[in-house]
Amino acid sequence: MKKIVLAFDSFKGSVGSFEIAKAAEKAIQEELPDCQIIRFPIADGGEGTTEALCSALHAQTVSCRVHDPFMKPIEVSYGIVNNGAMAIIEMASACGLPLIDSNRRNPMKTTTYGVGEMVADALKRGCREFIIGIGGSATNDAGIGMLKALGTRFLDSGNGELEPVGENLIKVHQIDISQLNPALKESKFTIACDVSNPFFGEEGAAYVYAPQKGATMLQVIELDNGLRHYAQVIKEYTNMDISQLPGAGAAGGMGGGLLPFLNAELQSGIEVILKTLRFEEVVRQADLILTGEGKLDRQTGMGKALDGILRVGEKCQVPVIALGGAVEATEALNRMGFTAVLPIQPFPVTLEEAMQPEFTKENIERTVRQVVRIIKQFTK
């Protein structure tokens, strides 16, 4: 085996894609010292998006102070490219799940306000083009936090201004954009989303993703009702129906919530990443693609990173093996086209133990070593 491409997404809440790829590379080097290894850390719009794009485009990294999902001060960074014209912003850096301890997660109370502050900072620096990766969030506020930070006001039936959090979507009665940052009129946004889910419903933002953000079943229902209500308010104010738009449910509804108010378009995050980084050119002469993410399940085939990698692998006739911290629906994943799908856990552990960064890296290294040892026996 002469060439292996490592194209891992982040193991959300545990280890980023760069560190995962380094652990896999170490295992391959020990077993196949003459093999060419190409580390290609990727992202689908969530964690690692800024890192992957900024690395490929040699971006300038800038920092700013914003607010986290619970409105606590935090320092974040983002990339600027194209001679200062474009900002590459990762939503997860301001309101991602890893910023909140698992026992404190509550999408009823979290906000995307900090993302809006990042955009405002970039506007001040002269940026007018934006790529915003919107996966991996701890929020379900449909982007009203971000819009509030940019000047939008959300009012209840008594004209009181609402706090921009998930539980208040159901209370939105009026939307006031009269104070929206004027620089937005000359700005363009590419919203890189990691899923194709609609805004609400059984496959929407609340039902599919809110539980992993800490929501109880009752809260899921309340959030979904809020999204339904807010979609209707948006339609009344802008004449845009975002209810069943593919990707509108990404990042707690942020995918759809931004389109009516910004010069924005939704694109598959993985397509943005792979095209920018010219992934297909790298894969053409490879013998194997190793990929993976924290959890492999039915969502893996819904426009997420591994689905995009698999499509390129199939096009170039290169086998794709996927590793996951947890694996569900193995047969369905095999039918999607993966050569093999493997869990990395060596024995039963608690979720908290499984998410420990060092434990995850050790498991990746051990699993990749076993995969390579098997391959060696059949390629002698």
Predicted features, each with a name:
Residues 2-134, 138-380:
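N-terminal loops that bind phosphate or other acidic moieties
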